[in-house]
């Protein structure tokens, strides 16, 4: 089997991850080529069709039409920049990540601890997505979704709302017509490639 790694269309922090994938594939006896349309399995970075990754969309669409597998590499959801996702045919819930029956060894290795369900908190957090991501396919414009969510929350709750836009899909000032809605602009953490201060302090629930 031949893996084609599309590093030309990866984010600036992706090269070491592509290299690690290539090393692992070769150690298992597979062939690896770079940016070659003739591979058996394409390996791309993210399903955000924007910026450097925009040209991955043609690879993704072609593979869907041909029932050809696509491995998606992406920054990890836990300890970003330290852990990384490797999914088959998507990311998050759309992807296959291998066997599900895992024990707690990996969580222990990452010093993760499951906390009790939060029943307190002041704010309802609405977390925006990037509307050019494959995750947002067949959905309304992000601005419409956010406004609809604010109206829906305010119809059922008097809790104040925090709107936290995606760092690269900021939707300036769309919440101004509403009372009791606060914009929280993510700030990049010093020394990181794309980590932001996305904490959940005093959050009652999150809508995303």
Where in this protein do the model-derived segments appear?
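N-terminal pre-catalytic "stem/leader" segment of glycosyltransferase-like enzymes
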Residues: 1-47, 132-133
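Catalytic donor nucleotide-activated moiety binding site of glycosyltransferases and closely related
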Residues: 7-10, 147-191
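Short, solvent-exposed loop/turn segments at secondary-structure junctions
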Residues: 10-11, 48-50, 76-79, 129-133, ...
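Well-ordered, non-membrane alpha-helical segments in soluble/globular domains
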Residues: 14-21, 52-58, 140-152
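Short, aromatic/basic amphipathic alpha-helical patches
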Residues: 16-25, 54-64, 173-180
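Short, well-ordered secondary-structure micro-motifs within conserved domains or adaptor modules
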Residues: 34-64, 201-207
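A nucleotide-sugar donor-handling region in carbohydrate enzymes
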Residues: 68-139
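A donor-sugar binding/catalytic signature common to diverse glycosyltransferases
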Residues: 188-208
């Amino acid at each position: 089997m031949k893996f084609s790694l599309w590093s030309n269309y990866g984010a600036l922090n992706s090269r070491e991850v592509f290299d690690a994938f290539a090393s692992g594939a070769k150690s298992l006896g597979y062939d690896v080529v770079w940016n070659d349309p003739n591979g058996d399995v394409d390996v791309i970075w993210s399903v955000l069709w924007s910026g450097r990754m925009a040209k991955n969309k043609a690879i993704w669409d072609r593979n869907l039409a041909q029932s050809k597998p696509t491995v998606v590499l992406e920054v990890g959801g836990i300890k970003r920049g330290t852990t990384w996702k490797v999914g088959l045919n998507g990311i998050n819930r759309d992807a296959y990540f291998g066997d599900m029956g895992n024990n707690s060894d990996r969580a222990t290795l990452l010093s993760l601890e499951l906390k009790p369900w939060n029943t307190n908190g002041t704010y309802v957090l609405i977390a925006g997505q990037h509307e050019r991501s494959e995750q947002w396919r067949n959905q309304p414009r992000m601005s419409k979704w956010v406004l609809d969510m604010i109206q829906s929350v305010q119809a059922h709750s008097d809790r104040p709302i925090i709107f936290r836009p995606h760092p690269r899909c900021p939707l300036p000032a769309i919440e101004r017509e509403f009372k009791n809605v606060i914009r929280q602009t993510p700030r990049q953490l010093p020394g990181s490639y794309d980590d932001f201060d996305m904490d959940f302090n005093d959050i009652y629930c999150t809508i995303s």
